[in-house]
């Protein structure tokens, strides 16, 4: 079924549905540093993607095939289910993340800048030199959920996504959302100079 008018979808996925990816643990990036010593438990993980101009069928396929829960479970994160939603815009998704109604969001990097006090940047899409900062995608977590705001969950998420990017099945699923996905760990401070230039340019355009 294709619902072209649907801009927000919410679905609870079981672990068996989300856990469709297999990886070689010895080859997965960041395994040693990305596994919390104490299990992290979440009854439901709320994940949101920005719909934008993306094809609805691709987004539905992404929801069904992305093995994020399985990748996190390999890093000692126990998740009962995952609720996947698609935001109407980058700003709407960033606000949902800041409010705490979303735990993890895939969204443009620049959408994170206005919410530095309430969200934490986890990963940024790797890009060639010269790529405009507004063209880079990011993955961020809310600070409102005390479980996902921990260093342990953040490390596990970074390791899980980097492993998915290196895995053929995981990369294929992510490519439904972003062409040639390749995320790397990042912090907001990594983009201080680029952010300042972007905000100065944006302010000048408004004035």
Where do the protein language model's features map onto the residues?
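Positively charged n-region of N-terminal signal peptides that target proteins for export
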Residues: 1-9
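C-terminal motif of bacterial Sec signal peptides marking the signal peptidase cleavage site
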Residues: 15-19
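Bacterial signal peptide processing site
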Residues: 21-23
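Low-complexity, Pro/Thr/Ser/Glu-rich flexible segments characteristic
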Residues: 26-38
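Extracytoplasmic small-molecule ligand-binding "clamshell" domains
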Residues: 37-113
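An extracytoplasmic/periplasmic, membrane-proximal ligand-sensing/linker region
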Residues: 39-46, 54, 58-67, 157-207
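A bilobed periplasmic-binding-protein/Venus flytrap-type ligand-binding module shared by bacterial periplasmic
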Residues: 48-52, 134-155, 160
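Ligand-binding "clamshell"
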Residues: 114-131, 135, 144, 201-205
């Amino acid at each position: 079924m294709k619902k072209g008018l649907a801009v927000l979808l919410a679905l609870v996925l079981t672990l068996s549905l989300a856990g469709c990816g297999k990886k070689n643990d010895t080859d997965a990036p960041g395994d040693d540093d990305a596994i919390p010593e104490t299990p992290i438990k979440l009854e439901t993980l709320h994940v949101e993607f920005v719909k934008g101009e993306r094809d609805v069928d691709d987004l539905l396929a992404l929801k069904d095939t992305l093995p994020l829960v399985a990748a996190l479970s390999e890093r000692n994160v126990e998740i009962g289910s995952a609720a996947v939603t698609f935001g109407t815009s980058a700003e709407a998704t960033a606000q949902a993340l800041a409010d705490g109604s979303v735990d993890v969001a895939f969204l443009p990097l620049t959408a994170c800048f206005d919410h530095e006090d309430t969200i934490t940047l986890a990963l940024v899409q790797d890009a060639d030199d010269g790529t405009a900062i507004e063209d880079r995608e990011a993955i961020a977590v809310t600070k409102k959920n005390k479980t996902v705001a921990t260093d342990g969950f953040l490390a596990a998420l970074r390791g899980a996504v980097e492993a998915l990017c290196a895995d053929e099945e995981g990369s294929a699923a992510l490519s439904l959302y972003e062409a040639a996905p390749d995320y790397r760990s990042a912090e907001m401070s990594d983009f201080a100079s680029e952010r300042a230039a972007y905000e100065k340019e944006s302010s000048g355009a408004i004035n």
